[in-house]
Amino acid sequence: MESAARELRGVLIQELKQLEKVRTYDELRTQVNDIAVMLAKRMRDAIIDDMDFAFRNGYSSAYGEIKGINKTAAKAPDLKPEDIEVLRLLKTEGALYNAYNQFQNILVEKMNATIMAGIAQGSSIPEIVQNMRQVGIGETYKLTRIARTEITQIANEGRLRGYKRAEGRMGIQFKYSLIIGKDTRTCPAHQELDSRIPSSGMYLNDLIMLQQEVGSKYRMNLRGHSLLHPNQRTSLVRIV
């Protein structure tokens, strides 16, 4: 995601540099939508690719951690249809889905506002384009930041699926925990969750029930099994 975002910022800079050559404000406005459509499509494609990779890599790496399982191949078995359905839902709902769907409209709106402000201030076209560039880079950064935290959640969901597949093959239940970031950005809900998970871990259903209890107390919008809510640096792990 980070490399794709850097590449797109470079593309944005080049596209806007060409706009410095236009002669009228009307011509400048007509180019905004085309640039926004191009950037939105490329951002969406990069995000979808990263979501798919994060889920599948989480699944295969979690399954591969399990020792003593009768593995018939060097890699994890193929995803089950229900796993693929979970991945499909993760791609079509939630904060990241909303963010990349709104990206194009927000970009068009803010770039047009920048043009109108520049006209009102009597700015030259190159000056307006410079301000448009900052808007585009800023919006790309915001979407990348949302994607970073949401894709962590998707990787956790993949890990959960890998662990559950191994549980089924071995006929036993594992214990799990959450590695939760501990700094000033950690919300009270996660602080409480961290303090209530025993060092020996918890069976999955018990961990889910604890998350639901804490989430309800703090009025969190729970999504998925492995995170309390998306805006935390939290990873699902199996306790050995």
What are these regions (language model features)?
Residues 62, 66, 70, 104-110, ...:
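Residue-level detector of solvent-exposed, low-hydrophobicity positions
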Residues 1-50, 149-240:
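Activation/maturation switch segments at domain boundaries
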Residues 1-137, 239-240:
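N-terminal leader/targeting and assembly helices and adjacent pre-domain segments
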